[in-house]
Amino acid sequence: MIDTFGRSITYLRVSVTELCNLRCRYCMPEDGVCKKEHADMLTEDELIQAVEAAAALGITKLRITGGEPLVKKNIVSICRRASRVPGIREVCLTTNGILLPELARPLKEAGVSRLNLSLDTLDPQKYAHITRRGSLDDFWKGFHAALDADFQKIKLNAVLIGGFNDDEILPLAELTRKYPVDVRFIEMMPMCDSSGFGPEAYIPFTRVLKALPEAVPAAKDGGVAKLFHLPGALGNIGLISPVSAHFCGECNRIRLTADGKVKPCLHSNAEYPLKGLDFDGMKAQLEAAILGKPQWHGDLDVAHKSGAGRNMNQIGG
C-alpha cells in the first residue's frame, strides 16, 4: 500500500511481548515493566489475523520483536503460522540471543530466515552492566547456536554509547572478518527515561568511520543502513542513523505492539487499536495507520519529552 507521501509500506514489525529476560539500560527500566493482563494483549489468533490483514494491504516482510520475543512461550508457533500467511515472503526476528541454544533450530524450521542479535560490547563486565543481568558467555552460546542453525542472514546490532563502547568500534567491526555476519552500529535515540545516559552518549558516525580507516563503501543494499566493508571480511558493517540522518523519506514500515496498537511511526503518539476487531476491522485500522503515517518523525528530543508514548521494549524498536 502507498502512503500519503508516496512511500510503499511493505514491512510490519510485530512486538509479541513487552517482557524481557534482560534490562538493557537504553531500552527498559531496571525493575522491568508491569505485566499487563492477558486479556489486554493480542492472542496468537488475533496476531495472525493482523498479519493476514496487513498482507492483504501489501505487507510482505515481518520482523518479530519484543521485549524479548523468545520469552514468549508460543513464539515458535507464532513464527510458523506467520510464515505461512499468503503474501508474507520473509519472517525475521530480533533477539538478545540468550535463549537461542534451545530455540535457534526450531525457529529456523518454523520459517524464520534472518536473525538480528543485540551485542553492545565484547567485555563481559560491560555486558553485565549494560544489560543489568546478562552474561556474555550466554550470548556467545546463543550466537553459535544461530550459526549452526544456518539462517539466511545474521546481523549483530550494537547501540553506540559515548563513554561506554565507543572504544570497541574496531573490535566489534572485526567480527565481520571472523564470522559470516553483518555488524550494525546504531545511534542512541532518546527513548527511555531510566537509561541514565546524557547528551554525551551520542556518537556521530564520523567517529565510527575514523575508527575504521580500512572500511570502504559496500555496493550491496542495506535498507536503512549505510553499508561498509573491511578487506577480507565475510560480512558488512552497517551504520544506522535515525537521529543525524533520518531515513523517513524511505521508511517502509509500521509497528504493531503486543497490546494490539498499530504505530505508524516509532516516535509518534498516534496509535490505532486492533484488539477485539475482526479481519475487516483490522484491515481498516491498518489502512488508516498507513495513511496517517507522518512525513518525518520531527525533533526526537521534543517527541520524547512530550511523551511519545512508550519505552523501547514496549514498541519493538
Predicted regions and their residues:
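Auxiliary Fe-S-binding modules of radical SAM enzymes
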Residues: 1-11, 178, 188-317
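Canonical Radical SAM [4Fe-4S] cluster-binding loop centered on the CxxxCxxC motif
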Residues: 4-44, 266
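Residue-level recognition of specific faces of alpha-helices
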Residues: 8, 13, 26, 50, ...
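Conserved, mostly hydrophobic/aromatic
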Residues: 16, 20, 64, 93, ...
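Glycine-centered loop/turn positions within well-structured domains
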Residues: 22, 124-125, 246, 272
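Short, flexible helix/strand-to-coil boundary loops that buttress conserved ligand/catalytic motifs
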Residues: 28, 104, 131, 266, ...
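A short acidic, helix-capping loop that chelates divalent metal ions and anchors anionic groups
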Residues: 32-37, 123-130, 192-196, 273
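Radical SAM/AdoMet-radical enzyme domain recognition
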Residues: 41-64, 71-186
